[in-house]
């Protein structure tokens, strides 16, 4: 892996990419992990069909594994949707498939039995590991090349994990590979049979915020340490900084407020006529931020965004609260709710309800605050950082007396303030 990254560098190719506004993003190329053996007979997933079931179930119960290493395009219509993002009843059907797989394994010789047909796992899971359109390739766990009886190219004993994006550094890729090897070794020894969680709307609410992804991923590392694999959280700190970049910080009245990037699923729009064909656009006009507050007195202080109170949720640590902000950042010609205008810049106020005034605040702009339009992409990380810093100010809070509205927490997304509803 390090050789490939170095060879790309020597060929004047870069593994880093920056958007016009300076955001650090993936290069667009897939970093799909392909697992298998030298021959189909050596594939661990054909020798132990329960191993794939363990991986799928563990990924399902730990959404951080799906979202920490993925690209910008996530959600039901992405290139690698989770099983429970495809259809509402897929988790129920997946449990039936796991039970049937185990029944067939027990009938044909038990775990590791030589009498288990190699095509068995393909037939049982093929119609579960799909996207909303039934595409078997566009799935988080792609088994097209595992052992499909349809043709020789499908009988290679290979499992493709598509929920990985190329990281900017070789060692970030290496630690991903190490994580996969450790999980496979763990489940080879002890199959994962825990009941599948019904995440519901929580999947696209709580687990799109970096704080809760970090908590869930810490549980994963804890499981690996109990199994004898000494993983340290610091090894994955670059991944969290890459996926949930720091936007800015504010300190006022003994309270610390941190704004970070968050994940946002992109929706595919309905069909429209294109140049000689039919096209379906992707709505990337909505963005999401995470606001984390430390030292807050929930009886006294309220955090508002454009005058709307945030539905802050406790993290389990005293005085620490987190919430997400979802807002229309860009005006696209094809988007959900096209009549809703751009809601940027965001003004985040830390309000003292006892005095009725803001202790301080900050502003976040999605583009240059002076209205300048960048014509070229950043040439390096320094220029990209300067563009990011130019869009956040620790000034500009709402002056004068403030009347805070009554907090209306969403029933479907209690961790998120969706400004499109206001």
Q: Where are the regions that the model predicts?
A:
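A short beta-strand motif that forms the metal-chelation/ATP-contact edge
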Residues: 30-35
């Amino acid at each position: 892996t390090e050789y490939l990254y170095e060879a790309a560098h020597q060929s004047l190719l870069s593994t880093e990419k920056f958007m016009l506004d300076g955001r650090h993003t993936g290069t667009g190329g897939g970093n799909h992990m392909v697992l298998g053996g030298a021959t189909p007979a050596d594939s661990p997933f054909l020798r132990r069909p329960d191993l794939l079931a363990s991986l799928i179930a563990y990924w399902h119960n730990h959404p951080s594994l799906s979202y920490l290493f993925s690209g910008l395009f996530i959600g039901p219509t992405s290139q690698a949707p989770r099983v429970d993002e495809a259809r509402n009843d897929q988790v129920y059907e997946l449990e039936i498939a796991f039970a049937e797989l185990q029944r067939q394994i027990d009938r044909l010789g038990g775990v590791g039995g030589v009498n288990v047909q190699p095509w068995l796992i393909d037939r049982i899971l093929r119609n579960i590991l799909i996207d909303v359109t039934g595409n078997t390739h566009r799935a988080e766990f792609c088994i097209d090349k595992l052992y499909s009886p349809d043709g020789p190219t499908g009988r290679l004993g290979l499992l493709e994990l598509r929920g990985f994006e190329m990281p900017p550094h070789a060692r970030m890729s290496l630690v991903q590979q190490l994580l996969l090897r450790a999980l496979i070794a763990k489940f080879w020894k002890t199959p994962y049979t825990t009941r599948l969680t019904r995440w519901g709307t929580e999947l696209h609410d709580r687990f799109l915020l970096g704080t809760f992804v970090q908590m869930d991923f810490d549980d994963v590392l804890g499981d690996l340490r109990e199994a004898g694999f000494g993983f340290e959280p610091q090894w994955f700190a670059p991944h969290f900084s890459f996926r949930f970049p720091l936007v800015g910080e504010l300190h006022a009245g003994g309270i610390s407020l941190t704004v970070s990037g968050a994940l946002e699923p992109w929706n595919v729009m309905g069909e429209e006529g294109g140049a000689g064909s039919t096209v379906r656009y992707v709505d990337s006009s909505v963005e999401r931020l995470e606001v984390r507050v430390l030292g807050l007195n929930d009886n006294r202080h309220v955090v508002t965004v454009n005058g709307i109170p945030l539905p802050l949720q406790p993290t389990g640590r005293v005085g620490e609260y987190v919430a997400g902000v979802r807002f229309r950042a860009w005006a696209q010609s094809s988007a959900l709710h096209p009549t809703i205008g751009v809601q940027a810049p965001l003004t985040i106020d830390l309000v003292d309800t006892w005095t009725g005034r803001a202790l301080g605040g900050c502003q976040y702009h999605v583009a240059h605050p002076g209205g300048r339009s960048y014509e070229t992409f950043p040439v390096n990380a320094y220029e990209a950082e300067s563009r990011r810093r130019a869009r956040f100010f620790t000034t500009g809070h709402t002056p004068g007396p403030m009347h805070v509205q009554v907090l209306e927490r969403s029933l479907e997304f209690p961790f998120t303030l969706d400004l499109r509803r206001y």
